[in-house]
Amino acid sequence: LVDTLPDITWCLNQVLLEQGCPALTAETVRGYIGGGVTAMIERVATQFGIADAVALHQRYVTLYQNNLVQFSRPFSGVLALLEGCRQLQVPLAIVTNKTEEMARQVADALLPQNTFGTILGHRAGRALKPEPEVAWEAAQRLSVDPQRCLFVGDTEIDLKTARAAGMYSAAVTWGYGLTPTLQAQAPNFCCEQPAGLLRILQQVCGTAHVFTDHGDTVKSY
């Protein structure tokens, strides 16, 4: 939905510069995204031999909380996608490994109000993706059968979550994941642009069979 890489990169580089480490390119940071902030910081700490990953994590989180939407913007085409979903009356939820508070702040700042029925992020006692519980919780809050849900994501962790939760999956290649990596997870759909995802929803909304017309072949949009 939102390209948060610029703010993540900026904050991470500020923390690294404080440690006397060189700055990372956005493309390098892109490869570290997935699995939550703790996993990202652990990868960075390992790369630079930083012993106190906990302190690094705390400093990064503090900085990022104050710079959530300095450079972040919705991906091109996302606002039109959300408007299309509104017209189709598709119930939507956000499921993220960001902290729930951060996810809500980003959505409130950059996405249309009242778009999402629920926003679920990381918090104490809630397992991160790819564990399926958070996806099931989202479906429950939307009053939708998980087997009728389409779980959309740009990382292999998202697609593993969909599989674990028994949901249909759509890989989107405009985000952070590499297309071959996403395709290796055999998603039900693969979308290069938000408009492609909207076409999927337009095709299946109001039909009784719900997604089953695609068979076992990945459809690209």
Q: What are these regions, as identified by a protein language model?
A:
Residues 1-31, 47:
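Active-site neighborhood of HAD-like aspartate-dependent phosphohydrolases
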Residues 66-94, 100-105, 132:
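Short, acidic loop-to-helix structural element flanking the phosphoryl-transfer center
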Residues 15-16, 36-50, 106, 138-139:
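Helix-loop "lid/cap" segments that line or gate small-molecule binding pockets
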Residues 86, 99-100, 104-221:
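Asp-based, Mg2+/Mn2+-dependent phosphohydrolase catalytic module
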Residues 43-80:
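Metal-dependent phosphoesterase signature
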Residues 8-9, 26, 37-41, 53, ...:
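A general structural signal for well-ordered alpha-helical segments in protein cores
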Residues 21-22, 50, 112, 144:
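Helix N-cap/coil-helix junction residues
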